[in-house]
Amino acid sequence: MQNYFELLGLEQIYNIDLKILEKQYFAMQIKYHPDKAKNLQEKEQNLIIASNLNKAYYTLKDSLKRAEYMLLLYGVNLNDEKVRSKLSALELSIFWDEMELIENTSSYKSLEEIKSKYELMEKAEVNFLAESFKKQDLSDATIKTSKLKYIHTLLSKLQEKMKLCK
């Protein structure tokens, strides 16, 4: 499988320009559209390329998926128990406390406030991640990616809960 950054003609950095990503993606989709194929073999090849382009685009477009993918390129698998255990007990405790807070909150306004807090935390974590990858500090990038994953989980839980409160 080709490196997603290479496939889309992008520099392999975390802090990518999403507008350039989108521009490259659409240009490549047009170039390799199966309907433009001259024969069946080329059509099948274009289908595979188009599928890979979709995977690459949706992976690189998302800050968490992009971080996980970059770590994977460096040989770090977040599903490894040793890697996941890099978060401190305090950080994990805070995460579970926040999950419980969300579960026990029934006011839409309160949920919105919590969501705003976590959206700010998400932005900050993405900025920290960009720095970690820039310095090639994989240990720190791994921790920051794990934190970002927990923040995404909390935001997802918040959105579910907010739908129920409407």
Swiss-Prot record:
Domain J: 3-73
Keywords: Chaperone
GO molecular function: ATPase activator activity; protein-folding chaperone binding
PROSITE patterns in alphabetical order: DNAJ_2
GO biological process: [2Fe-2S] cluster assembly; protein complex oligomerization; protein folding
InterPro entries linked: DnaJ_domain, HscB, HscB_C_sf, HscB_oligo_C, J_dom_sf
Gene3D superfamilies documented for this protein: DnaJ domain (1.10.287.110), HscB, C-terminal domain (1.20.1280.20)
Pfam families named in the record: DnaJ, HSCB_C
Family from the record: Belongs to the HscB family.
Role this protein plays: Co-chaperone involved in the maturation of iron-sulfur cluster-containing proteins. Seems to help targeting proteins to be folded toward HscA.
NCBIfam families attached to this UniProt entry: hscB (TIGR00714)
Assembly and oligomerization: Interacts with HscA and stimulates its ATPase activity.
Protein name: Co-chaperone protein HscB homolog
Source organism of this protein record: Rickettsia bellii (strain RML369-C)
Classification lineage: Bacteria, Pseudomonadati, Pseudomonadota, Alphaproteobacteria, Rickettsiales
